[in-house]
Design a protein with these regions (language model features):
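Generic hydrophobic/aromatic pocket-lining and core-packing "Φ" positions
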Residues: 58, 96, 137-138, 158, ...
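Rossmann-like adenosine-cofactor binding region
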Residues: 163-245
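Glycine-rich phosphate/diphosphate-binding loop of Rossmann-like nucleotide-binding domains
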Residues: 106-191, 241
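An anion/phosphate-binding loop that grips the pyrophosphate of nucleotide cofactors and donors
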Residues: 21-22, 186
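N-terminal low-complexity segments that are often proline-rich with Ser/Thr-Pro
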Residues: 2-20
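Adenosine-phosphate binding glycine-rich loop
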Residues: 72-113, 122, 223, 228-323
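Phosphate/diphosphate ligand-binding glycine-rich loop within oxidoreductases
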Residues: 25-103
């Protein structure tokens, strides 16, 4: 029987050891380095992994012999990522809130109020990526009174956003030219581009920073997948920002961790049915009966079973066998 180790929430770590009785279910968050040696064959770990931007974690999972089923690559037939949606909704909203906070002069920003006031223009926000995070960020920023621009490479998605978002949100097709044009007077940039299971593309390079005004705030929600900005590196809630060439970078890898009461409930609502299926049926039968869950298999008993992860690290890929 497989020991099941899974995260029902994004932010709370309840048990600190995998060495428990057989069939015990541990509530666990994303693995950290001191815990790698505790992983072993016979365990199913169901949580966020983001292996495409963490070689050390990938190697540890392969070495462990455990079955690693990643929340972020569970994907339904209509291309939805149901276990990313709740955290994306939280992170997108928080991205605009945090961007507005660090736009204050006392925090290194330009000293602008997101909404402006009568007779004074509001802040300008550029959202890169029109997925769940981007839509949530744009909607929140618009609700705060900002002038918002959102980019994507899908025209059908841009049409949908144009129809559904408030009038102070404008859609742009994502090209380097269009992005550079908006950077000249932007106040906040939210990076929210996602390639499922793969590294995020760098849409803003270091040389593009000089086109922005000092005090511009970059919020990189895609930092878990390597980040949308070339100058991004992961930060923490205790030390969330840093500056590069006068540009404020916010790149906290677990943004929803700041609002655990909301994010815990939201993620539990999405993950519980999958966790129960794994516990009741075993991982092979559960993945055999649910194609979305099958796509979550990233590493199985020493083999990488998610192609994007294998390709990023130049490792052998082998489809998971669940028959």
């Amino acid at each position: 029987m497989y020991q099941i180790v899974f995260a029902l929430n994004y932010v709370v770590l309840v048990f600190k050891s995998y060495m428990c009785a057989e069939n015990t279910r541990n509530v666990y968050s994303q693995s950290i380095k001191p815990e790698y040696p505790l992983l072993k064959h016979g365990q199913l770990v169901f949580t966020y992994f983001h292996l495409a931007c963490d070689l050390e974690l990938t190697e540890a999972m392969v070495k462990s012999g455990a079955v690693c089923l990643a929340y972020e690559t569970v994907q339904t037939a209509d291309k939805r990522l149901p276990l990313l949606v709740p955290m994306s909704e939280v992170a997108g909203r928080m991205a605009s809130i945090n961007g507005a906070y660090y736009l204050q002069k006392t925090k290194g920003g330009k000293g602008k109020l997101m909404s402006g006031v009568p007779g004074v223009k509001p802040a300008k926000v550029l959202v890169l990526g029109g997925g769940i995070v981007g839509e949530a960020a744009a909607r929140m920023a618009a609700g705060m009174g900002a002038e918002v621009y959102i980019t994507d490479i899908s025209l059908p998605r841009l049409r949908q956003l144009d129809a559904e978002l408030p009038a102070n949100v404008h859609t742009l097709y994502s090209t380097e030219h269009n992005i550079r044009k908006e950077l000249k007077d932007v106040d906040i940039v939210v990076g929210s581009v996602l390639v499922p299971g793969d590294k995020a593309p760098h849409l803003i390079t270091r040389d593009m920073l000089k086109e922005m005004e000092p005090g511009t705030v970059l919020v990189d929600v895609a930092i878990d997948q390597g980040g949308c900005f070339e100058t991004s590196h992961p930060t923490t809630h205790s030390d969330p920002v840093y500056e590069v060439d006068g540009i404020v970078h916010y790149a906290v890898a677990n943004i929803p961790g700041a609002v655990p009461n909301t994010s815990t409930a939201a993620l539990t609502n999405a993950t519980l049915k999958y966790a129960l299926a794994l516990a009741d049926k075993g991982w092979k039968k559960a993945c055999r009966e649910d194609a979305a869950l099958y796509k979550g298999l990233n590493v199985v008993e020493g083999k990488i079973t998610f192609k994007a992860v294998a390709d990023v690290w130049g490792m052998p890929y082998e489809p998971a066998q669940v028959g």
